[in-house]
Amino acid sequence: MPITRRSVLGLLAAAGSGLLAKSSPALAAQSAQLPPETPAEYQHPAGSEIPPGPFKGTRESLKQYEVPEWFRDAKFGMWAHWGPQSAIEDGDWYARNMYIQGSDQYNYHIQKYGPQSKFGYKDTIPAWKAQDFDPAALIKLYKAAGAKYFMSMAVHHDNFDLWNSRYQRWNAYNMGPHKDIVLAWRDAVRAVDLPFGVSEHLWITYKWFSVSHGSDATGPYAGIPYDGADPANQGLYVASDQIWKDDLDWTENGIPTWWRQHWFERIKDLVDHAQPDFLYSDGQLPFEYYGYNLVAHLYNVSAARHGGKTQAVYFSKRFQDGDSGICVNDHERSIIDTISPRPWQTDTCIGQWHYKLGQKYKTPKEVIDMLADIVPRNGNLMLNVPLPASGHPDPEELAIVAAITEWTQANGEAIFATRPWKIAAEGPPAIANVAEANAGFNESKRRALTAEDIRFTTKGSTLYALVMGWPKYKFTIKSLAQNTALRVGKIQNVELVANNRKLQFEQTTEGLTIYIPNEAPSKYGNTFRITGAI
């Protein structure tokens, strides 16, 4: 069975106390413990210098960081996890799994293109033409759907840069679509006044892409090196000194200093080139002080653009990074079960991360359930709609985006620029197994929300109740009962957010009973504007 990012991060999250976060009330950490604060060999890594600014490349300095209000208000972002691996339209991690004999993608590749020794990943790149790519139209579509920020993938584990890179000739400006994809997205996003960010997945590439240096173990091509073993191709495939196949671990163990330095130079170039408002690393903040200097540089560049106060966000999946205050925690395909004191983000996708023909997508209800479950817990949702090779969403994807648009336009008041209430939810547990409620990659274990599920947000003195179904005639919110520990005030008014319709209600020691019309104004859940409770 091929190794996937889910299995790697899932195993790491379950690996034991040496690898798990202990301070976070949220999910267990998905990578190693933080390094010591000031190991001498990392105080001034050669070549990792950054221009002066309010932040220095130390954890102590980065603890000055404050999450900007724009991110707290945004709640919903969209992501283009799109690059040359989308060209084949056979799903995520194609560039790795095509070199793992026996995997589905290996079999697909060898049947369509022939042996990997003669036709490797590098040879698929020209198929990524992006001939229908219209970033301005897509950003207009996503903004209408409620997206308040947007992220472009900048480099995946495949070592291919999506900008006109100073340090990597294998990039989208030189080959494939022959476009600076990152700047094309950035210009479209900033034209409609949204924050723009980039994702980097490069730090683990040294290990991830090492399988391209191997060969088949059996069969007619046994022992014939794949194209990654050719020294002429090392600029793409990386000169790894061993092959991580079945033993790929999502840690920095075995990654040499030269690669850490190279990572820093590449991603610093990305920050300087694109001037992003946020940066996402697929994993932890990597490489000790190389990483700290990189994040300090991101924050300093932002501060220079915003009158001395940084408006940038950095996302890490090592939860000690966010818990220590230096950045924002990101939870891949997961929802935490508590109200976090610090803003956080879930990143997920309606299908596979890279486009796959015939894949089964999340339904609009599943996406809206996630958004309604995340925001009351002080989180944001970052949603990827995987683009085909052409750069234009398929009809089913467009239908999903249209349904999300309809819902957010009717109910967005209860989502955007809100803050958590005293409790996030009322109703049965979203995950029956308590041990899985805060586990990594738990989205598939969460049940569909129903009329029994109520979620709460606030804005000023207004309380919002998001009811994820439509009861018959009436329903009761037990959390809004009189004389409870929640100290709920006397309810003065209840309205449907979608149409401002005033509703009859009754508040007792049993709860707040709301009388509703026969037909729901929104298909996938409805929100109620309640005054007097706060």
Each PLM stretch: what is its role?
Residues 10, 31-534:
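Mature catalytic domains of secreted/periplasmic carbohydrate-active enzymes
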Residues 7-29:
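N-terminal export signals
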